[in-house]
Amino acid sequence: MAHDPAADSATADEPPVLPTDRHTGCPFDPPAGLTALSDRPVRRLRYADGHVGRLVTGHAEARAVLADPRFSSRYELLHLPMPMEGAPGELPPAPVGDIIGLDAPEHTRYRRLLAGRFTVRRMRQLTSRIERFTTDCLDAMEQAGPTADLVEAFARPVPTLVICELLGVPYADRGRFLGLVEVIFDQAAGAGARDEAYAGLLRYVGELVLAKRAEPTDDLLSDLAAPGPASDSGDLAASGLSDEELAGIGGLLLAAGLDTTANMLGLGVFALLVNPGQLDALRADPDLAGAAAEELLRYLSVADPLLRSALEDVEVAGELIRAGETVTVSVQAANRDPHRFPEPGRLDIRRRATGHLSFGHGPHQCLGQQLARVEMTVALPALLARFPALRLAVPPEEVPLRERSSVYGVVSLPVAWGEEQR
């Protein structure tokens, strides 16, 4: 029989709030308070506005929630588990083209249009270009050395170049969109600033869509924006998407495609540098790059949490989640579930880490996950091969962290390599 929290007595323990403080302990570990709450896979949680919903920390339970259509992704149904500066009491519906905040059938329509363009085969076809971008960044870094901020010199430029190439965004325009993306993910920025940044990104991509329709090139935006036979007015592309939808989808792909991978690369190199045994193993055997990428994705879990709303009463792990309750799925906790990953707090690049939830699960699983995998698999061994003596230029505790961002990572990563570089 499911446990019904509504039947609890008035003297029941007050539900905890979501722990987010990483100030103490290892910068790669979940907050200590979150680990303490992971003794039960599903528990009650108090949200920033006072709503009482659920926290899911178990790996199997997280997969079940993320795959179940009885849990909605619609923003207007959700409550925020942590306070965000200036966030409204009630969230508005997803903007046009934002497929993350939609359910079927709207989400299914967008997903079908895009999924075929992000297959494993198509992403692997980009490998040679990713290798070229990586080499160019390493050349520039080496010439400017022997010290660098790895974020500015490598972790951010590589995925920016790649997503620009894929979408058809001029890399020379990065000054127009990089700052906007930073604000969009900044939880400490006011709601007005985030909204203004998002609107600015949509304006930029909207201008690009019109340019692509007039003069198409070989890229994803041109493909999606190509006019249909009955769309002389430009109201609908052959893909069936309006200009507003194209701008929303393009903005989402641009922001997600560069920010998450950039933070994975920066934080991933940081994790390797403070785990020299793992770093040496990867340097000695570049064929471990694929397994290393999966393990770093599991170990670091930079995009967390994922939110859902129960559309009806649902039982998960013997707990009855009531219709209308928001469910916070902690990717960090699920990826450290010892029932799924033995010794989960240990970085082990030889581990079989497939099955982690860093790209989500179910119908909203990340479209760009194969691209991120290829980028990491190419970039990490190339960096270590180029700079055999790569090391932190500051003590680990002095590396600044992005603790108030929706995507966790390092603000900067000062590194040096010295005379042993090739």
PLM-predicted stretches and their roles:
Residues 1-422:
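Cytochrome P450
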